[in-house]
């Protein structure tokens, strides 16, 4: 555990930013809440954190944050930001847009349209406290510069598959090697051009879409390329009964078995949903070190819940993500807590606010191999943090700030977001981009997409 004692000597040069007066949840294992504490930031990192400011410390900018709560930035590890285009509609259709006729889907998007919508979704996520997003979708290469401009961390990939998605919504499942080859080549180019750029805020992953949309041969190729670069692989695993049925028909195996045989089932695999993990696969799944990406709101909206207690009891690392159509990780804390308790049929010590808070912070960092840099607030770590304004009726009294955060806070309570020591949200608004221009452009694009989709239905 990192020490939280202020140890900065008086001779230290001025800090870039000094935050005082706020309650602080560090997400460090076993660390207590710091009441009315202080955080010093210099050169993008946390210089000190504690109950008081060390003597002699000065800063280029000092902010009195009395009445606020500071937490680590939220690691939103699985996100398709462009799917803001089906907000308010797709959740009531029962299945993902790519599999559904009559609504806009990925294959309908131009690079410009995907960029506009992805920028909106990423903006929403950042305004709600996400400091890192795991973004994978079509035209990710075109959208990446616009997402990086927001100032948050972007771990991204093109959506990799060799099924012909243009035919999937009509019930045809055709695998074409050329589709997969073209997408993978584009993602390799994206990796070469962008991985590690923007001061390390950008990382390129390999997003193998799913076991039913990637042939076993294509999954093996993805595994080879990702392993050669030490890259993370983001996927949807056991997300639907249709997936389970199709994979069984095509291979005679389960999705977990298919990923294992392809060489993907290891500690670099980020597994979204995990709704239908076969009981016989659980020991193999847990032993692999793969990470579970829990997506409680989207799952519950379709009437389903992941077996999080079985996965946790098996020793798996559980992370959290918004997935599609909304980007509020604070709201998601509540969904994760509540749906987990519905599954248990009550309240127990094994599923408490501290558990879902860890999923949104340090567990996400662990899944990315970045737990020594991100996911908690400690001296030496990168300065990614969120400030919530708790001087509000629904956050009063602040008897237990963690309990309030999980049970009653909202993304709109976020007052400030700091990424790599830089303020990217202040007074609830983005500092580096024109919010209203992003919103207006996305509205324009979405209206055009819906008009086209309805004409084709």
Segment roles from a protein language model:
Residues 261-268, 309-392, 408-409:
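His/Asp/Glu-enriched, well-ordered alpha-helical/loop segment
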Residues 87-152, 183-199, 442-445, 454:
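Alpha-helical scaffold segments that flank or form the walls of functional sites
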Residues 73-77, 133-135, 154-156, 204-208, ...:
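Hydrophobic faces of well-ordered beta-strands that scaffold small-molecule active sites
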Residues 134-137, 205-221, 300-302, 367-369:
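Active-site glycine- and acidic-residue-rich loops that bind
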Residues 1-37, 42, 47, 361-457:
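Active-site microenvironment of metallo-dependent hydrolases
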Residues 145-275:
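Metal-coordinating catalytic core of metallo-dependent amide/deamination hydrolases
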Residues 85-116, 158-180, 241-268, 291, ...:
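Active-site gating loops and adjacent loop-to-helix segments of metal-dependent hydrolytic enzymes
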């Amino acid at each position: 555990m990192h020490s939280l004692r202020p140890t900065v000597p008086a001779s230290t040069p001025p800090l870039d930013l000094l935050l005082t007066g706020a309650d602080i949840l560090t997400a460090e294992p076993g660390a207590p809440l710091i009441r009315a504490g202080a955080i010093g930031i210099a050169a993008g990192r946390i210089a000190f954190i504690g109950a008081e400011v060390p003597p002699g410390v000065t800063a280029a900018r000092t902010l009195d944050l009395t009445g606020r709560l500071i937490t680590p930035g939220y690691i939103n590890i699985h996100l398709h930001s462009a799917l803001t285009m089906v907000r308010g509609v797709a959740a009531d259709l029962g299945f993902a847009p790519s599999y559904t006729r009559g609504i806009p889907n990925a294959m309908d998007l131009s690079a410009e349209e995907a960029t506009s919508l992805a920028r909106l979704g990423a903006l929403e996520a950042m305004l709600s406290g996400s400091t890192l997003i795991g973004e994978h979708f079509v035209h990710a290469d075109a959208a990446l510069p616009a997402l990086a401009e927001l100032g948050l961390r972007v771990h991204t990939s093109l959506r990799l598959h060799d099924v012909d998605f243009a035919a999937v919504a009509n019930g045809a499942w055709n695998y074409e090697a050329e589709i997969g080859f073209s997408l993978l080549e584009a993602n390799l180019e994206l990796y070469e051009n962008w991985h590690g750029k923007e001061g390390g805020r950008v990382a390129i992953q390999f997003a193998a879409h799913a076991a039913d949309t990637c042939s076993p041969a294509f999954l093996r190729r993805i595994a080879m390329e990702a392993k050669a670069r030490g890259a993370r692989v983001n996927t949807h695993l056991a997300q639907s009964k249709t997936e389970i049925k199709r994979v069984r028909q095509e291979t005679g195996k389960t999705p977990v078995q298919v990923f294992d045989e392809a060489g993907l089932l290891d500690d670099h695999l980020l597994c979204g949903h995990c709704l239908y993990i076969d009981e016989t696969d659980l020991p193999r799944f847990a032993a692999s070190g793969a990470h579970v990406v829990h997506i409680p709101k989207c799952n519950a909206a379709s009437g389903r819940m992941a077996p999080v207690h079985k996965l946790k009891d098996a020793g798996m690392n559980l992370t959290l993500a918004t997935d599609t159509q909304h980007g509020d990780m604070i709201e998601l804390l509540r969904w994760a807590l509540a749906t987990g308790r519905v599954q248990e049929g009550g309240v127990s010590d094994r599923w408490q606010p501290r558990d879902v808070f860890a999923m949104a912070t340090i567990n996400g960092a662990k899944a990315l191999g970045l737990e020594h840099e991100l996911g908690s607030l400690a001296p030496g770590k990168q300065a990614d943090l969120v400030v919530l304004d708790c001087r509000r009726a629904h956050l009063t009294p602040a008897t237990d700030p963690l309990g309030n955060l999980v049970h009653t806070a909202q993304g709109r309570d976020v007052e400030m977001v700091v990424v790599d020591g830089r303020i990217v949200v202040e007074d609830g608004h983005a500092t580096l981009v024109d919010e209203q221009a992003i919103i207006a452009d996305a509205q324009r694009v979405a209206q055009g997409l819906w008009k086209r989709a309805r004409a084709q239905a």
